Structures are given as C-alpha cells and as structure tokens.
Amino acid sequence: MSKLSKPRPARRFWNWVQNDDGSRTLYLDGPIAEESWLGDEVTPKQFKEELLSGEGDITIWINSPGGDVFAANQIYNMLMDYKGKVTVKIDGIAASAASVIAMAGGDVFMSPVSMLMIHNPATIAIGDTEEMEKAIAMLEEIKESIINA
C-alpha cells in the first residue's frame, strides 16, 4: 500500500481532558452532526460515551459554527441530566445549534471578543403546499424548543 492509499485516522474536533482536581474539560471545536461522515463532527452518540466515561464537574469550551439542531438538542439534554456541575466558556463562537449546547451550562461565560449567534431555524423544502405547511410547522416547533433552552 502506498502512503497515499493508507487510511488516515479521523481528526476529531473535540477533546476531553482529565484535570488534576478531578474535574474534566471538554474542548468542543467543530460542527455538530447527528452522524459522523468525515470524522470531524461532534455526534450525540460519541458525546454520550465520553460524557459518561468519567465523573466530576465539567467545563466546556465551545468554538463551533453549529450544525444539526436535533443533535445539539440531544447533547443539551445529556448535559442537563449530568450529575456534576456544567460550566460553559465560549471561546470564539457558539453559533446556531452550538448556542443550544451553550445553554446547558449552569454558568456560561464569554469573553468580550467571543460571539453567541442565535437565529431562527431554517430548512430547505420541496413539495406541494401540504409539504410546505409541514416544513413551517416543523420550523415553528424547533424554534420553540430552542427558545426553551
């Protein structure tokens, strides 16, 4: 096998660090997705496995453009159910779906140069008026769910 045809390990854009005081730090740095296609997305399944693999308080540093709101909602719920204290620090940007995850922190901190971007949900839809009405109803439900975060 040549060097070019060798599979490369997926590069992950999140990393858990075990701190000396027993707490953990998560660096969440990349797009939020339901499934991993390129190996760089934060997915709920992977997140849950790593969240439950330790204990103690956690600090989450977020720098993410957002992504799949349903995946973000799952991660938000996991963090809300977590037994330890959850602190969020926005490092750069917590945009779109990442802003939902940021709201799971008991304390949320931002520097003066970081950004939190919240917007109305959006989608692409094709079909007749019935399909468009379904899409509108779905967007309204998503909007209400993220407002509740």
Positions of PLM-derived features:
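Terminal-region recognition feature
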Residues: M1-A149
